[in-house]
Amino acid sequence: MKTPSLRSKLKPHLWFQAYWVIYLIWFFWLDLTIKNPKYIIHSPIDDLIPFNEWFIFPYCSWFVLLAAVTAMLWWYDTESYDKLCLMMFSGMTLCLIIYMILPNGLDIRPTAEAIGRDNLAVWIMQLIWKADASVNVCPSIHCQSSGCMALAFSQSKLAKHRPALKAVAWVWAGLICLSTVFTKQHSILDVVCGLVLVAVWVPFLYGKKTKIAD
């Protein structure tokens, strides 16, 4: 049996990544047009979570997780790759629709004076805050996509009979979700809503396979 060529793998599956063009245009259009969100997302739990600038590093590691999981599943397990794209892109699309219908934002970001510290992590945080307005936050796309990546990878052929890899995927995704609230990029409500968008796919895509993968 011949090993599938790069061209044969590119043709049926990689075109899913064209969605990113649509997503980025749509996302930044919303970011530029929604300046005064109608709904402010807040929970009393948010007030109990301290700001910690060092969580900006797991927050930014989302890009590494996205690239790594997408590439590995595309190359080694196209069935899981297709499921990842279905879960993640449909969820991201729903999030953008919600932002349009229910424009929402946050008011929990601390000022530089309130932080009272000057270090690399704070500097990175301030750069992100300048570029990323505190609007379009619920559900959290950061958390929704992280959950999809952990789920798809942990149920893939790559993680089958490799509990350590499953643990790494879930711990990494968990740290990313935690980072969103410790950096005040999101409310805990955003996180919960984002993860709900992941959970709804489990019975449809993994109801039977979960037993096999374990």
Where are these regions (language model features)?
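N-terminal transmembrane-helix/juxtamembrane module of multi-pass inner/ER membrane proteins
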Residues: 1-66, 116-118
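Aromatic-anchored segments of alpha-helical transmembrane domains
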Residues: 24-29, 92-101, 171-181
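Membrane-interface loops
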Residues: 31-44, 74-164, 212
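Interfacial helix-loop-helix junctions of multi-pass membrane proteins
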Residues: 113, 133-138, 175-202
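Membrane-interface capping segments at transmembrane-helix boundaries
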Residues: 204-214
